[in-house]
Amino acid sequence: MYRPAISRPRVLLVVSHPSVGAAIETILRLERRYEVRRAAKLAEAVNLARSWPADLALVDALVLRRDGRAELGAPALILAGGAAEAAAAERSVDNPQGWVAKDAPSADLVAAVEHLLTGSLTTEAGSLALFGIGVLVLVLAGLLLYLIWIAVV
């Protein structure tokens, strides 16, 4: 299967609850960094993984407990209510790489996905972005000093 050299990472989301799945899919799509496909059942996810190779599978522990073992062909991040549930679910996927709490803030969920995809714990600003922030700080400081000078004179 052809994949362009420059593409967005593919995330396969496996969550059976429609509202929860839609919410997580929306969070990931709002980042505009990922291609996201969602499956409600494990069998559907396995079929999707064959035709659409994902870079990461984000899998609800409840789906694994109900549907059994899965060969998704991608590193799996488990959505679980706690460490015990995550440990049990990790035995059901072929390449478990950790877990994230179901009640985690969206920033933590995105950070966990990003960490597995890039190996980096945080996304860092580049030197141009830092330069821009420095220029803005200097301009704002200059404006503040100007306003103080006008108020005094």
Segment roles from a protein language model:
Residues L79-A125:
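Output/docking surface of receiver
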Residues L58-L62:
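Active-site residues of response regulator receiver
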Residues M1-A5:
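Short boundary motifs at domain starts and secondary-structure transition points
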Residues R8-S19, I24-L28:
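Conserved acidic segment of CheY-like receiver
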Residues G68-G73:
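Short, conserved loop/helix-junction motifs that constitute active-site signature segments
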Residues L121-V153:
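C-terminal single-pass membrane-anchor helix
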Residues Y34-A40:
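Short hydrophobic/Thr-rich beta-strand motif most characteristic of the beta2 strand and flanking loop
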Residues A40-L56:
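Acidic, metal-coordinating helix/loop segments flanking the phosphotransfer/catalytic sites
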